[in-house]
Amino acid sequence: MDYSNKTVIVTGASNGIGQGVAVGFAEKGASVVLADLDEAAGVEAAASLQEKGWQAIFIKTDVRQESDIQQLMEKAAQSFGSIDILINNAGKAKFTPLHELEVEEWDDLLNTNLRSVFLCTKAASKYMKENEAGGAIINLASTRAMMSEPNSEAYAASKGGIVALTHALAASLSQERITVNAISPGWIETGDYARLRTEDHLQHFSRRVGRPQDIARACLYLTAEENDFVTGINLIIDGGMTRKMIYEE
């Protein structure tokens, strides 16, 4: 896969999965725009790519603000000439007991995780539809869109909304040659992988916990031009956990 003529925007790219995805595209030759609210970490992440000779810039962005998103798209297009791929990764996770969950917290989480996907896609697709090859959009959902634990109402609603929004967008943008897919990660360790316990790994069918690179490789597959027959799906990457029986032996 050659992405040397592609401009990729990754939101929430200062660390974790987003940073891993940014690295994955940069390695394949893409020009990468890292967007995040954390300016210090974002500048550092972009610099680490630039030091390797890769094309990368950081643009401070609050995905809750439509004006920030419009500015992100304008600067990205001005810097690299086009917008070809959007990775909607920005999000937050907070688990508050139901009877303590205030509407302000609910709104903030849904605005960050779900509304941002709508706003970023709406803004980016205006540029993508001008491309001869169209474009590709990936929305990061979660396995918590399909399964839950206590106190996850706001987070689950936001991620479930992303899955539904994804196939709606795939339908709406199909005439503009833009594919839209979701990825639902399971346990992706973004901290010290070496500190994980043996039982952490063995509870997965894959016999290991996931890494950001697992998500990056999926993004590369779903955004490759030759894979334009894949659109509207939710790709679950969880080492088999959502297919595992929960009953103890």
Q: Can you annotate each of these PLM segments?
A:
Residues 147, 220, 231-249:
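Short C-terminal tail/terminal secondary-structure segment
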Residues 14-16:
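Conserved glycine-rich cofactor-binding loop
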Residues 87, 174, 179, 230-232:
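Short, small/polar-rich loop/turn modules that mediate ligand/substrate recognition or access, typified
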Residues 97-98, 105-110, 200-201:
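Substrate-binding pocket helix/loop in short-chain dehydrogenase/reductase
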Residues 121, 158, 166:
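Active-site helix of classical SDR
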Residues 126, 171-175, 228:
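Alpha-helical segment proximal to the catalytic Tyr-Lys
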Residues 142:
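Residue(s) in the substrate-gating loop at a strand-loop-helix junction
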